[in-house]
């Protein structure tokens, strides 16, 4: 998995592609990194990563 610095320095298009390549537990780890960051980021930029919809279902217990 990429480091915090790598994630924050990725262009948004590359970050979306990276998010789509992760498993649900890995997405959860990345989400925690972004939650703990002091810099406010627009979460809507990542919503076009199609894998995030699957993760939201996973996080809410809808998907195993």
Task: Please name every model-derived segment.
Residues 17-64:
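Acidic, low-complexity, intrinsically disordered interaction modules
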Residues 1-7:
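Extended non-catalytic scaffold regions that mediate assembly and binding
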